[in-house]
Amino acid sequence: MCGSSTSQEDVDKLLDGAVMDLCVTDPPYNVNYGSLQEQQEKVGKSKNNHDKILNDNMDDESFHLFLYDFYTQMMRSLKEGGVYYIFHADTEGLNFRSALKECGGSVKETLIWVKNALVLGRQDYHWKHEPCLYGWKEGAGHYFINDRTQTTVFEDKVDLEKLTKDELIEMCKELMEEQVPTTIIHEDKPMRNDVHPTMKPIKLIGRLVKNSSRPKENVIDFFGGSGSTLIACEQLGRKCYSMELDPKYIDVIIDRWEKLTGEKAVLITE
């Protein structure tokens, strides 16, 4: 649905009375990502999509309130014991954690997504990971897959045999440039973010969905972005409720879903 994740009216319209079992979402990081990508492209360091992300360049107080309003809707939508995964930037870690606590949530663990390539920036250490807050709504036990091998670090290796020639060339260029200190090493991420500037790998999202929900359960993504959560749910037999504020990314999500399923999306209401 095209709407705001901070609006109770919009969220109620999306849910239509349904209760969510799981939330996997990737809110704006408040890092003005589109502007950074434009600068990198000017010096030949980036060829990724650099469209602006809405609500990604706020002052501290406004961003905290934005997160508070989103968390309020998230906690309201989840069943007791419903799990949430919140990707975020370490630079805004305090806001992400404190706003969650103010809404009655808590951080049980912080997971680390380790990428296979650094993100170029102006800081001394180039970022090569993203944290993800993990927790659940109090009031009942939460579901977790019967697997005691899970760790807080996701390190999916790149399958070189499956990469195209262009992807291999791109990876070699990144590796040649990567003679700098990084926060941490290894991961598999999209070689090019052609449809969304911060697109998450479907495999990464799929792991979280599989770990914390059962087939046919309801999964909500308050910031649909490129549609990776919806695609992962489609592949794993979950029902996804996805909200996205920007109409152009609504089109991206629909296009990815139609290509995956071979079906045609239907507009329910204007």
Go through the PLM ranges and name each one.
Residues 263-270:
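Short mixed-charge
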Residues 1-250:
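Core catalytic lobe of class I
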Residues 248-259, 263:
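Short alpha-helix adjacent to the SAM-binding motif of class I
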